[in-house]
Amino acid sequence: REVQDLLGFIKLDLLVVKDLEVIRLALESIKSNYGIEINIENIPLDDRQVFQMIQDGHTTGLFQFDGSAVPKRILIDSGADRIADLSATNALDRPGALNMGADKEFVERKLHPEKTTYMTPYAEPYLRETYGTVCYQEQLSQLSQDKHIIGFDAGQADTLRKVTAHKDKKKIEKMVALAKETARSNNVPENIYNWFCDLAVEFGKYAFNHSHSLAYAVIAYRGGFLKAHFPEAFLSALCQIKPMMKGKDKTT
């Protein structure tokens, strides 16, 4: 990976997402059997029936939410009712985040917003969406660029994002040292920049990309929309594309 980076090569992960095929097949079935043509890209993203189904734990067949029991627990316990909650759940379902108790913090703060706190008011714009819990690489990068927290320029912030994403301990330590130096030059209080640096070290254990997580959430939601409103078409498509799902969860 380091050699590829030095040579300027772009790394592309090309993965097969069978859930997209499930959605396509379900849409074809709905059109054929009910005469209803759905533009899946234009469905409402706040459908109450979809989120009620998710809150009830009926996530079988929903992308990223039908395997481990962890995301289902987070969705149920938090009463997920926004795409942003689905996205955060994806990011929190990582060993490092779970070991740090970030999932429990997220659930508690979503249920009781008054318990949401910020180390500094300047952190709120970047963490408000996730109730003060850091979930994404982008949040760490944004925090680092605020002159009241660290004051990195865009290039330094992106380097920090990369080293945490790659979980490179030595490079993370180097960036933390630079962060402290930069913060001091910006007259940032010691407790603020130490908080951020501790966060960067811990975050390097589980950093997750927001755009990645959000894309996952949208796929899950679209599947959930079809499952909630056209269960026969969705489950039929699911069994055809993912035959191993048959009988997996009788509660669906």
Residue ranges and their predicted role:
Residues 1-252:
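Noncatalytic, beta-rich nucleic-acid-contacting surfaces in large DNA/RNA-processing enzymes
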